[in-house]
Amino acid sequence: MTDLERLQAWLETYPRAGELTSYQVDYTDQLPGCFGVFPAGMVEVERTENLLGQVTVQNQYNFALYVVFAKAPGDTEGAQINADWVMDFQQWVQEQSVLRKAPTFGNIDQHRERLRAENGALYDAELTGTAMYMVRLAATFWKHY
């Protein structure tokens, strides 16, 4: 299973995932209930080498999660419901990471790995009655070579 497949399988365990209907990578339909994960690459944060030449690398995967909900222009109640979903999702990610239930990506120090959901916000709203929200996902992990 690839790292992206593990992330997807884990996202589907979110208790409110049933409110979403269609999962895609690098794309999402502009229909309520659709969501997409957009991988934004890996960043090497730090690299250390010991006296034996063994290398440990701290990495960070970055993803953007886009979710489309119904929201008519001026619909404050719908906006509140959508914002509550986004905030609940971010809290769930934090809880899963703290309890070590989130997916891990490294080959050492997996107890130190951290998955964060940050900066959830309205990304775009259409006059047709949909709104797209974006949450940044970041996974910090270590690899030993």
Label the model's feature ranges.
Residues M1-Y27, V43-Y145:
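Charged, amphipathic alpha-helical segments and their flanking helix caps
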Residues P32-V43:
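Charged, often glycine-rich, active-site loop that binds/positions anionic groups
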